[in-house]
Amino acid sequence: MNYFELFKFSPAFDIDTALLAERYRELQRAVHPDKFANDTEQQKLLSVQRTAQVNDGFQTLKDPIRRAEHMLSLRGIELSHETTTVKDTGFLMQQMEWREALEDIRDSADPQASIDELYQSFAQYRAQLTQQLTQLLTSEQAEDALLAADQVRKLKFMAKLHDELTRVEDALLD
């Protein structure tokens, strides 16, 4: 299912999330199962299925990584359950540096400063990836779609690493 069509958006990485939320509420009102309480069982079932599609579509489009994965899936590139790893040597080196910095936080003289520095480094790198991804996803070239898939893989890794950093920060605050 094309969630962009469901929510009446052109397929694009950058979307108006406020408008997305508004359209979500409109769709929810239109397909909510309570609205079909007096209808046939088939209508009730269709309403439940449609509600699930609307919910899944909203969750997909509001999350940048899932939105990019959806855009790529519409082009025949499935990333959601893949195990392919990033082969970019520069990114792998950066990944190792971040992991080392993450491990060194507990022994740091100023753990919070180290955490803040890592958050800033993540934000800068993620902004670069997102900018590149936006450009690649607007292209119609098959090669650019494959490059976009690599950017999404990097963003997925960054999201996991960000979660790890948040856990380390929470543990230090306890």
UniProtKB/Swiss-Prot annotation:
InterPro entries: DnaJ_domain (IPR001623), HscB (IPR004640), HscB_C_sf (IPR036386), HscB_oligo_C (IPR009073), J_dom_sf (IPR036869)
Highest taxon in the source lineage: Bacteria
GO molecular function: ATPase activator activity; protein-folding chaperone binding
Presence of keyword Chaperone: yes
Pfam families reported in the protein's UniProt record: HSCB_C (PF07743)
Keywords: Chaperone
GO biological process, one term: [2Fe-2S] cluster assembly
GO cellular component labels: iron-sulfur cluster transfer complex
J domain segment(s): 2-74
Statement: the UniProt record of this protein carries the keyword Electron transport: no
SUPFAM superfamilies, per database record: Chaperone J-domain, HSC20 (HSCB), C-terminal oligomerisation domain
HAMAP family listed in its UniProt record: HscB (MF_00682)
Subunit-structure text: Interacts with HscA and stimulates its ATPase activity.
Biological role stated in the UniProt entry: Co-chaperone involved in the maturation of iron-sulfur cluster-containing proteins. Seems to help targeting proteins to be folded toward HscA.
Family as reported in the entry's similarity comment: Belongs to the HscB family.
Descriptive protein name: Co-chaperone protein HscB homolog
Source taxonomy: Bacteria, Pseudomonadati, Pseudomonadota, Gammaproteobacteria, Alteromonadales
